């Protein structure tokens, strides 16, 4: 909470609690003295906290008063967001959330949900925003279902904060000649449900000739997909480059997977916010620009080794 809420406590109430056992004359004197002292302290505290949360006034009042932004996130997507060994939520998005929260004077509270339910949670107001390596697309902006093409809601606005392409990975030493998406025709791929990789696999399968479609198995999260590939239940997997690269680096001590081919479909990750809440959208954009300018953004991106996806400025609805 920012100090302006502390300042709402009146000097009279503060003085009364500290002088309840003295006589009437002493009470009057104490009210004056301690009241002035408390007001001075509040101003000092307020100045310090406002300087630490310079963009608090940009938030909608209800969120500012609550002191919390509820974030819908699929917390099984390392290194973007995941649970460490202690059960703490860590990753690129939580670190950025902490930095944005300092600018806005609120806590970013990450709530776990499967990826394909996050926008629904935003529509139902379960979340204030969704932050989960979500690609900013025109369909999502306009509330159009990626698979059916049907309108399913009012859509969302995105504040874009990172750029990532889609990668293919295979079991290490067993790439089966897979270098491009066309090489997957007649083979099986595992993906996370509702992602760009899932959509791309379906689109590429339609291009396959001779009846050799891509067999696609989708899962609630990438870790489940990786488990299936690791056990030999598929020929390849696909996910956003930061996630695929992290899996290649860490799974089995770097012995399980390898990246194949080049990234495709490079597009922005966006923080999704209801179109009915432009005030929150603009506050998030201002906070993101602030941490880009002060260098905190670059520190976080470098910490996770994904500098190639960094952006130089926040952008609203930059996806295509």
Predicted regions and their residues:
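Bilobed "Venus flytrap"/periplasmic-binding protein-like clamshell domains
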Residues: 89-103, 135, 164-221, 236, ...
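Acidic, polar ligand-binding/catalytic clefts
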Residues: 107-181
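A ligand-binding cleft/hinge motif common to bilobed small-molecule-binding domains
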Residues: 134-151, 202-203, 230-265
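Bacterial lipoprotein signal-peptidase II cleavage site
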Residues: 33-47
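Periplasmic-binding protein-like
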Residues: 162-170, 241, 249-285, 307-320
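A structural signal for short loop-to-beta-strand junctions that line the ligand-binding cleft
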Residues: 60, 92-93, 143-164, 257-261, ...
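Extracytoplasmic small-molecule ligand-binding "clamshell" domains
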Residues: 47-134, 294
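Extended ligand-binding regions for polar small-molecule ligands
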Residues: 37, 94-98, 102-103, 172-175, ...
């Amino acid at each position: 909470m920012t100090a302006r809420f502390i300042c709402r406590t009146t000097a009279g109430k503060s003085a009364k609690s500290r002088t309840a056992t003295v006589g009437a004359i002493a009470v009057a004197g104490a009210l004056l003295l301690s009241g002035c002292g408390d007001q001075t302290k509040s101003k000092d505290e307020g100045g310090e906290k406002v300087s630490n949360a310079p963009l608090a006034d940009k938030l909608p009042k209800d969120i500012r008063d609550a002191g919390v932004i509820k974030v819908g996130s699929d917390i099984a997507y390392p290194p973007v967001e995941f649970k460490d060994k202690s059960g703490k939520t860590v990753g690129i998005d939580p670190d950025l959330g902490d930095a944005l929260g300092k600018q806005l004077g609120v806590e970013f509270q990450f709530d776990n949900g499967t990826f394909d339910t996050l926008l629904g949670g935003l529509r139902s107001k379960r979340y204030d925003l969704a932050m989960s390596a979500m690609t900013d697309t025109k369909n999502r902006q306009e509330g159009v279902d990626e698979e059916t093409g049907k309108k399913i809601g009012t859509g969302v606005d995105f504040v874009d904060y990172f750029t990532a392409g889609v990668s293919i990975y295979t079991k290490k030493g067993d790439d089966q000649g897979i270098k491009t998406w066309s090489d997957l025709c007649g083979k099986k791929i595992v993906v996370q449900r509702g992602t760009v990789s899932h959509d791309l696999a379906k689109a590429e399968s339609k291009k396959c000739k001779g009846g050799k479609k891509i067999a696609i198995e989708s899962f609630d999260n990438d870790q489940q997909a990786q488990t299936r590939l690791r056990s030999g239940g598929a020929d390849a997997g696909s996910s956003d480059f930061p996630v695929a690269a992290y899996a290649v680096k860490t799974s089995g001590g770097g012995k399980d997977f390898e990246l194949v081919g080049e990234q495709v479909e490079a597009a922005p990750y966006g923080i999704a916010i209801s179109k009915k809440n432009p005030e929150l959208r603009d506050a998030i954009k201002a906070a993101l620009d602030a941490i880009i300018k002060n260098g905190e953004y670059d520190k976080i991106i470098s910490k996770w080794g994904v500098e190639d996806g960094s952006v130089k400025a926040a952008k609203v609805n930059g996806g295509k």
